[in-house]
C-alpha cells in the first residue's frame, strides 16, 4: 500500500508541474545576445606637451536572436558602459540603461543603447618657454591625469523577469538585476 500512495503523490506532483507549466505565461528561453560596440575616438593636442586628451564615443548595438518557436514580447535588455578614472584607475559605471524589445519567433532584432561620451587626459608635463633678457628659459609643470577612459561593457537579456543571456567585454563586469 505504501508504494501505491507514493506513486499517487508522485503522479499528482508530475501532473501539477505539467499543468502549471502549460497554463503559465510562456517565456521564450532561447534568446541570445551578440554585442557590437560602435566607437570613435578623437584626440586633441595639449599645448606644450606631447600628451593628447582623448574623447571616446561608445554605443552598444545588441543583436537578439530568438531561437524559440514563440514570439517574445517582454524582452528587456539591460546594458552598462564602464570606464576607469585616469587619476586613480578606479572602475566606474559611466552610463547604464534599459531597452525593451519584441522578437518574432525564429528571428533576430537589434536594439541600441544610448551614445556615451567619455573624456580624459593622461598625466603629462607641460613645458613653457620664456625669454628674459634675450635668454630662453624653459620651465615645466606636471599635470595630473583627469577624466575617464573606456574600459568595457556588460549586457543582460531578460524575458518575463528571467535572465536568458548575459555577455560582457570582461568577465568581471556584470549587470545587477
Show which residues each predicted segment covers.
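Hydrophobic beta-strand positions in extracellular immunoglobulin-like domains
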Residues: 64-66, 81, 157
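Short, solvent-exposed, Trp/other aromatic-anchored flexible loops in extracytoplasmic proteins
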Residues: 97-167, 171-176
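Contiguous beta-strand segments within globular domains
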Residues: 51-64, 72-74, 117-118, 131
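Sec/Tat signal peptide C-region and signal peptidase I cleavage site
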Residues: 19-24
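Low-complexity, acidic Ser/Thr/Pro/Gly-rich terminal tails and inter-domain linkers that flank the onset
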Residues: 25-59
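Bacterial N-terminal signal peptides that target proteins for export
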Residues: 1-11
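Acidic Ser/Thr/Pro-rich low-complexity disordered segments
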Residues: 86-101
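Short acidic, flexible loop segments centered on an aromatic residue
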Residues: 74-86
